């Protein structure tokens, strides 16, 4: 072998070793970032909803939850950002300086192609950019960046949410266990709130408050304000119902029963918590589940059973509340009182079960027609209820 051939062979070996080393470093970096993201998701989905300071009740609950969320977000996102910057610097150093222009053009092309393929992520990034621009141009100063006390929805929080979304979208992987843990946390939150409606206060959060106090009717569970609770379930209920539908579609009975029971408690909590927005969240989410499941065999029956279970639960919970004399816990100016004493829950549960049996017995073509009719009828009914409600105000 000539000297030139030996030199070429050595260069090929060196390049192969360097490429293998680079691939190993890339894999370790990805695994590390996935671990950080897993910790972040567990903290946000599991720890944050259940977090409270024993003995403080609802005093400064919003502040303590915000500081926990802010600190966890800054730590996890800071770690991910630092690792990414180091990786980019190393990648730039490995590139030949003579081909830096070509490298930049390739990178620019990749970014444009990536934005086209990830339209949702691009839209979220633009939303964060608009929030930053709004805070910079605002005359409110610190309030535009931080927000008000116990309502820290300024540009900083929006950017933290955008960063959390990007981190979860890139590095979350298939961490289904964390989603199930988040579902369990949401069920615990709902159960604590439902027990409070019966006069039980397992965590002592209502200690010191009496009937007539604003906190007694508006604050519940470990989330506090009923509007905060509705906002929390506007995210968690679609996730919970999607897990339930997936378990039912795959034929996992035990998981379907557990997830179905949890969803029943969450729907009941939204009906009784006092915010009309929470009732709308529950109804719209259930309707979307029925709509998206219309072409999938065997999903409408579990959803109808879940809905009938929620109706029976509402009937029983309302009866127990009246017998225990805890009816005054419900808001006087909301829809919760009407929900608690409505006598049509049993009839609605029977209708759901009858519809389930008829739907199960029909052939596929007639099932589709029945589904479309039920969905359109429910929309007309909802429109009628909304019009009646507006005219009554």
Where are these regions (language model features)?
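Alpha-helical transmembrane segments of multi-pass inner-membrane proteins
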Residues: 25-51, 73-84, 128-141, 154-167, ...
């Amino acid at each position: 072998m000539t000297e030139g051939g030996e030199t070429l062979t050595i260069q090929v070996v060196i390049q192969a070793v360097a490429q293998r080393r680079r691939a190993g470093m890339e894999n370790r970096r990805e695994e590390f970032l996935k671990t950080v993201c897993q910790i972040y998701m567990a903290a946000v989905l599991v720890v944050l909803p259940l977090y409270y300071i024993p003995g403080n009740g609802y005093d400064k609950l919003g502040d303590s939850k915000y500081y926990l969320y802010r600190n966890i977000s800054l730590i996890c996102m800071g770690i991910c950002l630092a690792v990414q910057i180091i990786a980019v610097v190393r990648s730039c150093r490995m590139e030949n300086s003579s081909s830096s222009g070509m490298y930049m053009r390739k990178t620019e092309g990749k970014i444009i192609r990536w934005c086209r393929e990830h339209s949702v992520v691009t839209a979220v990034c633009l939303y964060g950019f608009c929030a930053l621009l709004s805070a910079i141009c605002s005359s409110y100063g610190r309030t535009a960046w931080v927000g008000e006390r116990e309502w820290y929805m300024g540009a900083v929080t929006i950017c933290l949410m955008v960063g959390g979304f990007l981190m979860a979208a890139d590095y979350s992987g298939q961490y289904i266990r964390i989603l199930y843990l988040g579902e369990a946390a949401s069920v615990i939150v709902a159960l604590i709130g439902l027990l409070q409606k019966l006069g039980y206060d397992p965590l002592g959060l209502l200690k010191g408050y009496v009937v007539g106090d604003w906190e007694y009717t508006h604050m519940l569970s470990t989330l506090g304000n009923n509007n905060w609770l509705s906002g929390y379930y506007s995210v968690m209920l679609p996730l919970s119902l999607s897990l339930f539908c997936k378990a039912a579609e795959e034929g996992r009975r035990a998981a379907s029963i557990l997830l179905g029971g949890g969803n029943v408690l969450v729907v009941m909590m939204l009906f009784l918590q006092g915010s009309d927005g929470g009732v709308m969240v529950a109804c719209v989410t259930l309707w979307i589940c029925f709509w998206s499941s219309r072409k999938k065999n065997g999903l409408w029956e579990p959803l109808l059973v879940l809905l009938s279970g929620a109706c029976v639960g509402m009937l029983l919970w309302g009866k127990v509340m009246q017998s225990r004399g805890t009816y005054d816990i419900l808001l006087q100016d909301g829809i919760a009182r009407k929900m608690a004493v409505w006598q049509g829950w049993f009839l609605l549960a029977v209708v759901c079960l009858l519809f389930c049996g008829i739907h199960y017995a029909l052939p596929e073509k007639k099932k589709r027609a029945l589904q479309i009719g039920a969905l359109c009828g429910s929309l007309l009914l909802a429109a009628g209820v909304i019009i009646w409600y507006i005219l009554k105000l």
